[in-house]
Amino acid sequence: DSEMWREMGFEWRERVRKVYVVVCFFLYLYMIMPNTSRRSKILPYLKRDYAHRGLHDSSRLIPENSMPAFREAVKQNLAIELDIHLTRDGKVVVFHDESLKRICNAEGTVEGSTFDALQHLHLSGTSEHMPLFSDVLRYVNGRVPLLIELKLPDSNMKLCPAAWDILKDYKGPYMVQSFNSLGIRWFHKHAPQVLRGQLSSALTRTNPENPFLARFCVQFLLTNLICRPDFISYKLADAGNPS
């Protein structure tokens, strides 16, 4: 009898273990599931070629994320990917890096500088200056789609309402995206009509300045639970991630 009970106990534990694995699997799928209800609205964007940070060309003195780069992209009928930051005095500017060193050969950060101070800097040794986001929108004027990356160092969410205050009157096609899921969550809550995307890659191997848990959750798309992105943009080299 005791042997029979032991066997029954073993079989029961095995069943519980299998149920646990299945439940965890479906729970994970639920957590990483994007919003699929607007897939038809995403499709037109997938059919376009994109000028990453505008159609820049150092040999022609056209820096990345500059007005000439955006003019060239529009001229070639290319969709535009660009990046936005918030300055210390609340201006939304188009720039990729947090640091000013690589492009402007200057110390400091965009977030730590006023817009007037940034206008004294030049982009990649040219005569071009960091453009205002509103000026870029005014120029593009809906002629090509925009893919706008929210740059949110230190998870300062002030950029989100500032960007939305500019975007809410823009009539052209655009989507927003970010590595920071809190920024995507802000749009999910406050401007749900905006198409939004989660950027990700093998973040646990990079960006040590950010908390490991946050990088882990974004890498494995666990933060989709709080922001329900309409699309996921994953670094191609890291596409082996099981999520």
Where are these regions (language model features)?
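Phosphate-group recognition and catalysis centered on beta-loop-alpha active-site segments
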Residues: 3-243
